[in-house]
């Protein structure tokens, strides 16, 4: 589907297909944008998640001189998102001339802020974790996807250390957690004999997948584990990581949720088989492949999302985010750098900014994300750091 005009404002009709039930609902959203040449409207389709998301391509533009409004980022409370924020904010500030800020918080409230326009950009929208809210935001015309964030990630609710499975080689499935001898491995003094699961934090999309949301009762209930598992909210991503690291250091049993690629999973040897993902029903066995109905997480599709008001205010940012390419190599390198320098700064935000500057100085991968004029602005700024 193509649209063309000659430097005039046109009504751009975007058709959103939302697969939120057995039928596909088509919603038309009208948005006025300035288009300078013929561009294509593409749809990114994820078969496993069954969410169609349209991406509008824009001509690569350079902002005009003059005052520009502040761009507000969603400060999701985990490292990969905050590092991406820091890199993107530096480019937007030094390259495009916008002041930036971020509102920190968890997935659910920050996405509501994005829909309302309190937040302009969120660097990590995890699907299927946020399927319901995402589909509603797209359907209402409040948000659009403008690029791919991380590479496709994995996540699982039921991970155990390989050293536990080596001691109990027949423990290889969530069904085994229904047996007294296996759930006793992960029981704690206050869990009444149930296996303790260190799960997803309150306010994160994955929490609803595990314990239930508007779409379903959650993995624990639908896998028949309610009488066998005691769910524990670690409170923060840092506390979850500390619990996992502590168990591995002591060679203690632990049943936990996590995701990757991340520095923690790399350090603990996930790629080398030192972490076991207990067998679960395949995503294809669940309605709409949604894990909330009692199956494993499919591969996560992670999007960069923009509030639609920013289309008018800063259309030149859309090509930048469409070209964003935060590979696993970039991610793990930056997370490692952050871990090394975090204690040297007075605040986490300062440490994330220093991590971003280090990445931008040492890597040239990002040069292709921006026009030459913007690249020149950023290069000058980096030389002053």
Annotate the PLM regions.
Residues 16-19:
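C-terminal motif of bacterial Sec signal peptides marking the signal peptidase cleavage site
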Residues 21-23:
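Bacterial signal peptide processing site
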Residues 54-73, 186-194, 367-370, 378-385:
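Immediate post-signal peptide segment of exported/extracytoplasmic ligand-binding proteins
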Residues 57, 66-80, 98-103, 194-198, ...:
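Short, well-ordered beta-strand elements
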Residues 68, 208-228, 238-251, 316, ...:
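An extracytoplasmic/periplasmic, membrane-proximal ligand-sensing/linker region
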Residues 113, 119-123, 197-283:
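Ligand-binding pocket segment of bilobal, Venus flytrap-like solute-binding proteins
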Residues 142-200:
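A conserved helix-loop-strand patch within extracytoplasmic ligand-binding domains
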Residues 155-167, 300-313, 336-338:
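A bilobed periplasmic-binding-protein/Venus flytrap-type ligand-binding module shared by bacterial periplasmic
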